[in-house]
C-alpha cells in the first residue's frame, strides 16, 4: 500500500463568501497531495460526476467550484495514514469547518464517503443540514458512474 506517515492537509479549501454548498471528503489521496488539488486521482470519478451533473466539461476545477458556489474541503486537518487508504487513518485532527461556514453562505454540507461522514458526525456540531454521499473513489467500484450521478443530484437542489 504505502508508507505510514503523519501528514498535515497540504492545501486550502476552495471557497468564497458566496459559497452555498460544502463538499467534504476525508483526506486527499497521494495523487491529490502531489497535484495539490482535490480529487485528482485519475481513477476517482468526482470530476466526471460534476461534469455529468452540470452538463459541461470542466477545465478549471477551482473556477468551476467558485462559479457554482461550491466549497471543496476535507474533514481532516492532519492524520496518520498509509498511502491513500481511509481505513488506515488514525490520530485525526479535524479542520475548522465551523469557522469556514461562518465566513460563507453554506446551506448544506455533503460528505463524500463513509469515513468523511463518520468523522463529521463524531467531531463537528453545526446547525446545517449534512448529507452522506457515496465515495467517488475507485475503492467504491461497485457503484457505476450513472449511480453516482443520481446520488449526487441532491447537490443541485441546494444551489
Tell what function each PLM region has:
Residues 1-20, 41-42, 83-98, 121-159:
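C-terminal capping/extension of enzyme domains
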Residues 24, 111-112:
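Short beta-strand segments
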Residues 20-26:
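Short, hydrophobic/glycine-enriched beta-strand segments
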Residues 115-117:
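Alpha-helix capping/helix-boundary segments
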Residues 97, 101, 105-109:
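Proline-aspartate-enriched helix->loop->beta-strand connector
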Residues 50, 119-120:
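Hydrophobic packing residues within well-ordered alpha-helices of enzyme cores
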Residues 31-88:
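Short, surface-exposed acidic-centric catalytic microdomains
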Amino acid at each position: 500500500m504505502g508508507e505510514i506517515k503523519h501528514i498535515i492537509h497540504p492545501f486550502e479549501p476552495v471557497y468564497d463568501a458566496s459559497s452555498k454548498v460544502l463538499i467534504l471528503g476525508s483526506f486527499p489521496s497521494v495523487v491529490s497531495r502531489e497535484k495539490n488539488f482535490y480529487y485528482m486521482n485519475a481513477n476517482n470519478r468526482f470530476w466526471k460526476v460534476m461534469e455529468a451533473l452540470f452538463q459541461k466539461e470542466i477545465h478549471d476545477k477551482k473556477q468551476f467550484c467558485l462559479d457554482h458556489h461550491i466549497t471543496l474541503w476535507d474533514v481532516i486537518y492532519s492524520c496518520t495514514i498509509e498511502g491513500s487508504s481511509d481505513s488506515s487513518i488514525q490520530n485525526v485532527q479535524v479542520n475548522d469547518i465551523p469557522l469556514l461556514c461562518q465566513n460563507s453562505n453554506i446551506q448544506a454540507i455533503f460528505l463524500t464517503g463513509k469515513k468523511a461522514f463518520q468523522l463529521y458526525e463524531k467531531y463537528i456540531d453545526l446547525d446545517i443540514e449534512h448529507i452522506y454521499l457515496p465515495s467517488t473513489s475507485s475503492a467504491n467500484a461497485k457503484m457505476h458512474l450513472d449511480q453516482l450521478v443520481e446520488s449526487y443530484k441532491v447537490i443541485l437542489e441546494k444551489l
